[in-house]
């Protein structure tokens, strides 16, 4: 929205065109805007959640240190998502179909997560939205979105899967393979981030790092100078440049949320936040065809999800025997005696290393 205002004002005030003509400037401005919105609205929202008694539900079989988290305000993901949408509408180019798709993803998955949280925390339904209903909604949306993205990206000739650490090695993809891969990426990422969000600040830092990494790739691929210099296929579509702008909004809002979510957490994001952030990261990776880079940078999420799958599989196939003391795996380390803060910081370090490996792939090709 502001891009059009500054474009008009630039005819009367020299220098203001930088706010409408340069993606890099808008990346900076949207990150600052989303950060300030989240910081400004964070405290009032926490007080409102406390007043409404919308608090965290803690598992009875979990670590004893978690009992103090009971009734900590949750559904704070609404704060993140609202900040991202407002910032995107302010600083994004509203002519970009990709920006609107990302906003739609935030709204749809946010609605699923919100309804799930509402059932569990407000109506006191023990299991919330049934898993099969949640999966059905996610699946239908993901398949439709995958088909839409296939036709949009095929117009730009973006139907090759990029292989990290190589210059010209790509895997061509038809509609069937593309839809299947996109389906698993969106749903897998959504649920993996949801499983990771179990300790104070644990999920939001990896989310910010992955969003930053994907944003860097999006910026490079839509900038002809950088793309040619770094030997990336140039995407001649300014609409996709808005993906980098959107990633910056995720980073700003995520960092501000960490202010309230760091140990001891004053608020949790809930399913409304974790399900949505995971889904939107998956969609971004597909849009810029960096699915494998997303896998590398987000490997922490993959490990968390795999630990749950292995635990459930072992319990069912081995007569109740478990691999881990508790799943997801961050709880396993807690039950081994690691303090919560040590688990979180060490997982952040792992996530940072994975982020840096993903960035190394920009140059080492």
Swiss-Prot record:
What terms describe the molecular function in GO for this protein? metal ion binding; phospho-N-acetylmuramoyl-pentapeptide-transferase activity; UDP-N-acetylmuramoyl-L-alanyl-D-glutamyl-meso-2,6-diaminopimelyl-D-alanyl-D-alanine:undecaprenyl-phosphate transferase activity
Q: In which pathway does it act?
A: Cell wall biogenesis; peptidoglycan biosynthesis
EC no. given is: 2.7.8.13
Q: Which cofactor does it need?
A: Mg(2+)
As for membrane topology, the entry says: Multi-pass membrane protein
Major localization listed first in the record, in broad terms: membrane
What reaction gets catalysed by this protein?
UDP-N-acetyl-alpha-D-muramoyl-L-alanyl-gamma-D-glutamyl-meso-2,6-diaminopimeloyl-D-alanyl-D-alanine + di-trans,octa-cis-undecaprenyl phosphate = di-trans,octa-cis-undecaprenyl diphospho-N-acetyl-alpha-D-muramoyl-L-alanyl-D-glutamyl-meso-2,6-diaminopimeloyl-D-alanyl-D-alanine + UMP
Does Ligase appear among the keywords? Answer: no
The record's section on InterPro entries has: Glycosyl_transferase_4, PNAcMuramoyl-5peptid_Trfase, PNAcMuramoyl-5peptid_Trfase_CS
**Membrane spanning residue stretches:** 22-42, 74-94, 95-115, 134-154, 169-189, 201-221, 240-260, 268-288, 292-312, 342-362
CDD domains the record matches: GT_MraY (cd06852)
> Where does it localize?
Cell inner membrane
Domain of life assignment: Bacteria
Q: Which UniProt keywords are present, listed alphabetically?
A: Cell cycle, Cell division, Cell inner membrane, Cell membrane, Cell shape, Cell wall biogenesis/degradation, Magnesium, Membrane, Metal-binding, Peptidoglycan synthesis, Transferase, Transmembrane, Transmembrane helix
Q: Which Gene Ontology CC terms are recorded?
A: plasma membrane
Cell division recorded as keyword: yes
Gene Ontology biological process terms, A to Z: cell division; cell wall organization; peptidoglycan biosynthetic process; regulation of cell shape
Q: What protein family is recorded?
A: Belongs to the glycosyltransferase 4 family. MraY subfamily.
Query: What does this chain do?
Result: Catalyzes the initial step of the lipid cycle reactions in the biosynthesis of the cell wall peptidoglycan: transfers peptidoglycan precursor phospho-MurNAc-pentapeptide from UDP-MurNAc-pentapeptide onto the lipid carrier undecaprenyl phosphate, yielding undecaprenyl-pyrophosphoryl-MurNAc-pentapeptide, known as lipid I.
Extract the NCBIfam families matched here.
Answer: mraY (TIGR00445)
This chain's protein is named Phospho-N-acetylmuramoyl-pentapeptide-transferase
The organism is: Francisella philomiragia subsp. philomiragia (strain ATCC 25017 / CCUG 19701 / FSC 153 / O#319-036)
Q: What is the lineage of its organism?
A: Bacteria, Pseudomonadati, Pseudomonadota, Gammaproteobacteria, Thiotrichales
The gene for this chain is mraY
């Amino acid at each position: 929205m502001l891009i059009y205002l500054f474009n008009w004002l630039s005819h009367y005030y020299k220098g203001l065109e930088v706010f409408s003509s340069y993606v890099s400037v808008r990346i900076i401005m949207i990150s600052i805007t989303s950060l300030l919105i989240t910081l400004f609205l964070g405290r009032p929202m926490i007080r409102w959640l406390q007043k409404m008694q919308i608090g965290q539900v803690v598992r009875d079989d979990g670590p004893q240190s978690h009992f103090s988290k009971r009734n900590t305000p949750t559904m704070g993901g609404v704060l993140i998502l609202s900040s991202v949408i407002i910032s995107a509408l302010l600083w994004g180019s509203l002519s970009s179909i990709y920006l609107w798709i990302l906003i739609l993803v935030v709204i749809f998955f946010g609605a699923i997560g919100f309804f799930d949280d509402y059932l569990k925390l407000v109506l006191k339904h023990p299991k919330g939205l049934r898993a099969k209903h949640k999966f059905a909604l996610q699946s239908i949306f993901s398949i439709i979105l995958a088909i839409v993205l296939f036709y949009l990206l095929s117009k730009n000739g973006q139907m090759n899967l990029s292989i990290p650490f190589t210059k010209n090695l790509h895997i061509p993809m038809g509609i069937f393979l593309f839809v299947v891969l996109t389906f698993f990426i969106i749903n897998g990422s959504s649920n993996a981030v949801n499983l990771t969000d179990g300790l104070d600040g644990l999920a939001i830092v990896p989310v910010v790092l992955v969003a930053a990494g994907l944003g860097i790739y999006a910026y490079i691929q839509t900038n002809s100078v950088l793309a040619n210099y770094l030997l990336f296929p140039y995407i001649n579509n300014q609409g996709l440049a808005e993906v980098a702008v959107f990633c910056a909004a995720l980073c700003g809002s995520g960092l501000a949320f960490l202010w309230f979510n760091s140990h001891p957490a004053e608020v949790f994001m809930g399913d409304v936040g974790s399900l949505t952030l995971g889904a939107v990261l998956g969609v971004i990776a597909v849009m810029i065809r960096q699915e494998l880079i997303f896998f590398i940078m987000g490997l922490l999420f993959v490990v968390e999800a795999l630990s749950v799958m292995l635990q459930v599989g072992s319990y069912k196939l081995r007569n109740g025997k478990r691999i881990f003391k508790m799943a997801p795996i961050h709880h396993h380390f807690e039950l081994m005696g690691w303090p919560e803060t040590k688990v979180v910081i060490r997982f952040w370090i792992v996530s940072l290393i994975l982020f840096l490996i993903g960035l190394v792939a920009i140059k080492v090709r």
